[in-house]
Design a protein with these regions (language model features):
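Positively charged n-region of N-terminal signal peptides that target proteins for export
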Residues: 1-5
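Conserved, single-site charged/polar hotspot
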Residues: 7-581
Length: 581
């Protein structure tokens, strides 16, 4: 080690040995007054913030932890986003692919330079977990759906539950284009401990068949000292809560043993390479979180191959790149509000493997569509959602997620040729029983017959176990209703020996039965010779929610000669591809 580095090491150890306390998180009181204002104050729908010359950044206001970890940064007009690679770690090893500059969080803002290929280890010490409370989230509404929000408020108040609303998301501009992904959350009014919130969730599921999520509010951010060691296992610096690493030439980093698939049967570790910069931060448990700060285009290069077959037709890959770009922008400021990053690299947000997961074909598609997104005829950024297999007919957004109808997300037959003799979803049994539907997702060379049409059988014992939390006893009846134009259901009535209840929501229905392929399905009771219930048979079509672009159908359309703007115009009701930077 050079004398200069040794001297800097000594200065860092002295300067960072006594860490400064973390700054208190910013607060904004937009809603009803509270005795204790949380880190993320709730906002009443329709109430504007008071005029002030010191209003916080809309993406970072009220968020816990180091505030600039949550900022949407820009370089040359392109957004850069902080993506979680892994968290809950005690130690992480990494190497720069080019010359590296390290910045230590804490007093003095110390820096260190290191050569390409050097190996470094970050270890968390003196970690303290965040203290947080939670409110049960009862519903989510599009920003335009004030009527739906008001109706839900009255419903819950009539049930005896005090509620409040919170405005989530943000309005921000990119190269003159306005991106607005605001929405309303309807929350239980009382801030609860995690255990009490989980108990309230169970009660709501039992009484109303409603599966809820938790809205977390940080009362005290997590903190820790991050210890940096070189390849000789020598401590060269300490950082309070955060350590930044970047390669000025943009060559990026190799990270050892990246954890992925947490909670799934494919949970494992893999050495991976990433473009962009790295941030080592403290997660909510007081452990180490590794965050990749990467430009949106480079993010898509490592993301798109996980969303679609890299061997698919180039026009389908371009369509996927455009929709994925819009989906990422739509999630900014919506997820991971209590974490030191905006998005994660798992199924919860989008699977992202960095440079390791890139493919030449999908990289070419990202580069060919650089900065392009979908805009509706009235100039709005389209919520460019997609699912794997529509089953021959896409679905309306309001059937799947509630809220007002979105003109860009209208369900329609996804047929490549006229088929006047083929029954439609209005005759669902016949539609699902028809094998010769000329659907784009059936005619695609990547067609998945067992997803296009499928059956799922459950024994009576399995159904009773799956519905036990509903409190209806032994199940005697299952009825799917409130269907959309594709036949997808958004209401399930479950009756049993101890009563009946309803499960509302396309995703909630699918989750109840261990993630059914879709809710475009019929359900029939199966009985033995004596008429006793023995099980239940679901017959269905499609894989996923069915709103927006059918990914397998997009491949079929590309193979039939359609360009990516034509494909997107079809699935998003006339939407146009336009550059945002």
């Amino acid at each position: 080690m050079s004398k200069a580095v040794l001297l800097l090491t000594a200065l860092l150890l002295v300067s960072c040995a006594t860490p400064a306390s973390s700054p208190a998180p910013a607060t904004r009181g937009l809603g009803e007054p509270e005795v204790s204002v949380p880190a993320r104050a709730a906002a009443d729908a329709g109430v504007k913030p008071p005029a002030s010359s010191g209003l916080e950044d809309p993406l970072t206001s009220g968020l816990p932890g180091p505030q600039d970890l949550k900022r949407l940064d820009f370089r040359n007009g392109e957004p850069r986003l902080p993506i979680k690679l892994m968290e809950g770690r005690d130690v992480v090893t990494f190497s720069p692919r080019g010359r590296m500059r390290l910045r230590f969080g804490g007093p003095g803002d110390k820096m260190l330079d290191a050569p390409a290929g050097s190996r470094w280890t970050v270890r968390v010490t003196q970690g303290e977990a965040a203290q947080w409370s939670a409110r049960v989230q009862l519903g989510e509404f599009r920003f335009a759906d004030k009527a739906g929000l008001a109706e839900a408020q009255e419903t819950w108040r009539a049930r005896g539950l005090a509620v409040r609303t919170h405005t989530l998301g943000s309005v921000y501009g990119i190269a003159g284009k306005v991106i607005d992904n605001r929405r309303y959350l309807l929350l239980g009014d009382e801030a609860l401990t995690p255990a009490a919130a989980a108990k309230q969730q169970a009660e709501l599921l039992h009484r109303y068949g409603l599966r809820t999520t938790l809205f977390e509010e940080v009362r005290k951010p997590a903190s820790a000292i991050l210890e940096l060691k070189d390849e000789n296992d020598t401590v060269v610096g300490l950082a309070q809560d955060r350590l930044d690493a970047e390669t000025p030439d943009g060559s990026g980093f190799d990270v050892r043993q990246v954890e992925y698939g947490v909670g799934y049967d494919f949970h494992a570790f893999e050495d991976r390479s990433f473009r962009g910069a790295l941030q080592f931060a403290v997660d909510r448990s007081g452990k180490l979180a590794v965050v990749n700060v990467v430009g949106l285009e480079d993010l898509l290069k490592g993301l798109v191959p996980s969303e679609i077959f890299a061997r698919a037709h180039p026009e389908a890959l371009k369509a996927q790149a455009v929709t994925a770009r819009g989906e990422v922008l739509a999630k900014v400021g919506i997820k991971h509000l209590a974490d030191p990053y905006l998005l994660c690299s798992e199924q919860h947000c989008a699977v992202y493997r960095g440079r390791t997961g890139e493919a030449a074909s999908t990289t070419a598609a990202v580069e060919a569509t650089r900065g392009q997104a979908l805009f509706s005829q009235d100039g709005r950024l389209v919520d460019s959602v997609y699912s794997a297999v529509c089953g021959g007919h896409t679905e309306d957004n309001d059937i799947v997620w509630g809220g007002p109808p979105d003109p860009s997300l209208r369900g329609r037959p996804d047929l490549l040729e006229s088929a006047p003799d083929v029954p439609g979803p209005s005759n669902l049994k016949a539609w699902l029983a028809t094998s010769d539907v000329p659907a784009a997702c059936k005619l695609s060379s990547f067609a998945q017959p067992t997803k296009f049409r499928w059956e799922k059988r459950f024994t009576q014992g399995q159904v009773d176990a799956l519905t036990q939390k509903l409190g209806v006893g032994a199940v005697q009846g299952l009825v799917l209703s409130e269907r959309g134009v594709s036949g997808r259901a958004r209401l399930l009535t479950v009756s049993g020996t101890q009563g009946a209840t309803q499960v509302r929501g396309e995703l909630n229905i699918r989750r109840l039965f261990g993630m059914l392929n879709s809710s475009m399905a019929t359900v029939e009771a199966e009985r033995d010779a004596e008429g006793r219930l023995t099980g239940w048979l679901f017959r269905g079509g499609g894989w996923g929610h069915g709103v927006g672009m059918c990914q397998t159908g997009a491949i079929g359309r590309a193979e039939a000669g359609q360009s990516y703007p034509e494909i997107l115009r079809f699935y998003f009701n006339g939407a146009q591809v336009a550059p945002i930077y």
